[in-house]
A protein has these predicted regions:
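Flexible, compositionally biased loop and terminal segments
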Residues: 1-228
Length: 228
């Protein structure tokens, strides 16, 4: 990078293309998700090595429950595996937060979420990895408004933000979507109003360290006016 002082404070990833990657190589969808898991862990390592304070990964949306029961069940098993691997690979390097509608998941997975957050909370000053599971931007905003009304607080931008599932996470400076699609797909609609968007054709399992580095370099060259 030309300017290390312009590292983003928060990067968001829409990890798209696992199934199409698998199909392009003649494999079932689940194979693509497993390959995507390896890329996810590698990118987490790169984020931490670069000392980017926050990164959020869109892993499973509220709409993804509509997929076939077999694929959903395979993904739930993969989530448990990923969380176990993350616990070891990121040990004492960062905090891990799971954001989304926890109530959609089985109790054993919810317990995994609670344990992982509790065990890593002390390392938030070293970085925080946010994983969006059963996440949808509209669902998040609906839940935030319900919580805000119940609290009796005055409605403001600040109070709404404080009731979001992502409360405490800075708005992403960068959103990276792999897989060629050019939309946000219900990802962080409140938080991305000033995000720099990077849409890349590479399927998520094929996304590389060099590609991420090039995006960081391009971001460093951009002048962000934020409405000014």
């Amino acid at each position: 990078m030309n300017n290390m002082n312009k590292l983003p404070n928060c990067v968001g990833f829409i990890m798209d293309g696992n199934r199409r990657y698998a199909e392009s190589l003649g494999h079932e969808a689940v194979w693509g998700h497993v390959a995507g898991k390896d890329t996810f862990l590698a990118v987490v390592d790169q984020v931490l090595e670069a000392k980017i304070p926050h990164a959020i990964f869109y892993a499973f949306s509220t709409e993804n429950w509509k997929r076939s029961p077999g694929e959903v069940e395979a993904l739930l098993g993969l989530f448990k595996q990923v969380l176990t691997e993350m616990k070891e690979s990121t040990k004492e390097k960062c905090a891990i937060r799971i954001v989304g509608r926890w109530s959609d998941f089985r109790e054993d997975l919810q317990e995994n979420f609670r344990e992982l957050e509790a065990e890593t909370a002390a390392y938030a000053s070293r970085g925080t990895i946010w994983i969006a599971l059963s996440y949808g931007g509209r669902a998040e905003l609906t839940a935030a408004v319900e919580s805000l009304v119940a609290s009796g607080e005055v409605v403001s931008e600040e109070s709404i933000a404080a009731h979001l599932w992502t409360a405490g996470m800075p708005d992403p400076d960068i959103i990276i979507r792999t897989g060629g699609e050019q939309r946000l797909s219900n990802f962080l609609p409140w938080q991305t109003v000033y995000s720099e968007l990077f849409f890349v054709p590479t399927y998520w399992p094929a996304f590389t360290k060099d590609e991420f580095t090039r995006i960081l370099s391009a971001y460093a060259e951009r002048e962000r006016r934020i409405g000014k």
